[in-house]
From Swiss-Prot:
Residues 307-317 have a biased composition (Low complexity). Keywords: Nucleus. It comes from the Eukaryota. CDD domains: DD_TEX55. Disulfide bonds: none annotated. This is Testis-specific expressed protein 55. The gene is Tex55. Residues 134-143 have a biased composition (Acidic residues). Residues 8-24, 65-103, 114-125 have a biased composition (Basic and acidic residues). GO terms for cellular component: nucleus. InterPro entries: Tex55, TEX55_DD. Residues 104-113, 147-163, 292-302 have a biased composition (Polar residues).
């Protein structure tokens, strides 16, 4: 009695499940057909029981195989994703099938171990190849993602920069547009450089003008601070030689008269209570001579040299008196000496120092009034 082909290959390889089912069904039919033929020939009852038991075993095996194949199909996606779990499950199923087959089959039929090792090696190789392919694809995808993201980000930043500068737009693929943008950029840079050059030239000229104005002002100040030379005319230098000798003699006689009057007043108005103080008046008229300028009408003919003799005769008839210019210091000095003012103040100060009154102003006024009284009395006598 022939048995169907090796069932372990059908259980291990999922792609051959429909062929295995077909072979199992055909084997069961052949067994029934053979059993009927043996019965018609006139076999014994034990052979009929054996055929019926084999048919029942074949039907049970086909039902079990269909259920196991459905489980394998449902677990295929998870097995592909989890290779270790799929290997363990496949090994468990193979061991269970082998144990069931050994119990159901006669002892003379044994499975070849070489075929099992071959199928298990193929399955392991396919699973390892699939896992390596998936790992390689994931690594390549991971490598591609950062490079693509960096390229995209760099292109995006470049586009934003161009948009900010104003010479890159959405339709930048046009080469003419790019050349126009470059030309605009060049013109803009040229305009900026020309503007800076204009500023430099302006400030340079301004600094030059300021330096020139400063030098001009310094020169003007230097010229203004310089001393101008003085020029004396001959007429002014010769004026001292024209001083009249008569005025010198008159001034000398007046000074002598003042000296005599001063001595007479000091002797007559001396007081017993007052301390003796020498009353000498020093004048600076002895070493220096008083110079007076006299302008006469003798200078008039100088201006009338080209005029007629009749005009010169009329001018000689109307001569003005000489004009004398005196020094104000000498005039004040003569006034003080004439009224004896120095002697009066000398007496008042001497009395003030000697008496030391509480009210010096009132004391000085009282002294002046007493002097006025004495003068009036003297004049009346």
């Amino acid at each position: 009695m022939d048995e169907p082909p090796d069932e372990s290959l059908n259980h291990e390889n999922t792609t051959r499940a429909p062929d295995n089912e077909k072979n199992n069904i055909e084997g069961a039919g052949q067994a029934l057909h053979r059993g009927s033929e043996h019965a018609g020939v006139g076999s014994s009852e034990p052979t009929g029981d054996k055929v019926s038991g084999q048919a029942n075993a074949g039907s049970r095996q086909t039902g079990r195989r269909t259920s196991e194949e459905a489980e394998q199909r449902s677990s295929q996606p998870t097995e592909h994703r989890l290779p270790g779990h799929a290997e363990r499950r496949a090994s468990q199923q193979a061991e269970r099938r082998l144990s069931e087959r050994r119990t159901s089959q006669p002892p003379n039929q044994q499975l070849p171990s070489h075929s099992e090792r071959k199928t298990s090696g193929k399955i392991d190789g396919q699973e390892s190849l699939l896992s390596e392919q998936t790992d390689q694809e994931t690594s390549e995808f991971d490598d591609l993602i950062p490079s693509a993201s960096t390229d995209y980000l760099s292109a995006r930043s470049q586009q934003q920069e161009y948009n900010q500068h104003g010479y890159w737009t959405e339709d930048s693929s046009d080469p003419h547009r790019l050349s126009e943008d470059l030309e605009k950029d060049y013109t803009r840079v040229k305009h900026i450089t020309e503007k800076q050059a204009g500023y430099r030239s302006y400030y340079k000229t301004l600094a030059h003008i300021e330096s020139r104005t400063l030098t001009d002002t310094n020169d003007y100040r230097e010229t203004g601070q310089r001393l101008q030379p003085c020029t004396f005319e001959d007429s002014e230098a010769e004026l001292p030689s024209k001083v009249s000798t008569t005025e010198e003699t008159e001034s000398a006689t007046t000074i002598q008269a003042y000296n005599t009057q001063d001595t007479e007043l000091t002797t007559s108005t001396s007081h017993e209570k007052l301390p003796s103080i020498t009353t000498k008046v020093y004048y600076s008229s002895s070493p220096e001579k008083i110079q007076t300028t006299e302008y006469t009408s003798d200078t008039t003919p100088v201006f009338d040299q080209g005029r007629s003799s009749q005009r010169s005769s009329q001018s000689s008839r109307w001569r003005f008196p000489p004009i004398v210019f005196e020094d104000p210091y000498h005039v004040a000095l003569r006034y003080v000496e004439k009224h004896n003012i120095l002697h009066i103040f000398q007496q008042i100060t001497e009395n003030l120092v000697y008496e030391r009154p509480d009210d010096p102003l009132y004391f000085m006024l009282d002294q002046v009034q007493n002097m006025i009284k004495h003068r009036d009395e003297r004049q009346s006598d």
